[in-house]
Amino acid sequence: MTASAVVPFGARLAAAMDDHGPLCVGIDPHASLLRAWGLPDDVTGLREFSLRVVDALGGRVAAFKPQAAFFERHGSRGVAVLEEVIAAARAAGPGAGTLTIVDAKRGDIGSTMSAYAEAFLADGSPLAGDALTVSPYLGFGSLDPAVELAAATGRGLFVLCLTSNKEGFEVQHARTSVSPGADGGAGGTDGSPQGATVAALTAARAAVLNAGAEPLGSVGLVVGATIGDAVAATGTDLVAVNGPLLAPGVGAQGAGEHELATTFGAARRAVLASSSRAVLAAGPDPDALVAAAAAAAGEARAALR
């Protein structure tokens, strides 16, 4: 496929959200969930659990989000299961299957970041889903290898911006001595800590990369659904991002229809709500999983559409 023929991730995700509702189901094989499903906490249980989720919900939800750490904890055999899950999702449902966001939160510099990009974003890599979560805290520019390869292959990125863990405050809410410039970078400094917050600068950089994209750009942000007034408090312009907003914390972590609408406001149509435990706890019965996912998708649609 030529570069001009690649359909960008943002366009594919927007279509999937329209078709199935703005819901992403996380595949998080906690030891406790494996036990609840009557499965052993080993590679056999990991594989059985993950593929049951894909088999039950493939073609029924906008995306899956396997959390890489729960596969990596089982070593090389666990990583092989992650590869199998990505391939199964690609085959689940009509057309190109169900989108997969690999939640690995990679972030590094130079050749190391290039290697991560090749592992998770290159055509032909068994670990390459449709998008990857990345960390900007070595500087947004350190993500350039991933940005460039994702654009070339039609894949997407979700950059950590405003996360729901309380520890994120000390970095994401911190004020820098710069303000966003026309290129989304540092627009100037007076040496005092009165400029934009780290979160606002992250959003501004994503907005530049997504400029002119329709219906959505392919560089999204991770913005927790349970962050309260953090968007306003940090001066983060989510509407200007023009990209998808991955919102963990829906369901078991406490975010419902009211929290989604309040947190995201005018940017809510770009939100992809992510639910893991609230859906997975309904298993292992496939019909119960389908019903739980349908209920979660309905709630997300009511809040965001």
Feature map (PLM): residue ranges:
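Conserved N-terminal beta1-alpha1 strand-loop-helix module at the mouth
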Residues: 2-101, 288-305
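A C-terminal functional module that forms or caps the active site or interfaces directly
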Residues: 47, 221, 225-274, 278-279
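Short, well-ordered coil/turn segments that N-cap beta-strands
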Residues: 19-23, 59-62, 94-98, 128-130, ...
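Catalytic beta/alpha-barrel core
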Residues: 65-68, 73-74, 101, 129-139, ...
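Active-site-adjacent beta->alpha loops and helix N-cap segments on the catalytic face
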Residues: 73-88, 109-113, 138-151, 226-235, ...
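Acidic (Asp/Glu)-rich catalytic clusters
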Residues: 17-18, 54-60, 87-95, 147-153, ...
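Conserved anion-binding
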Residues: 108-220
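Conserved, mostly hydrophobic/aromatic
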Residues: 25, 64, 103, 132, ...
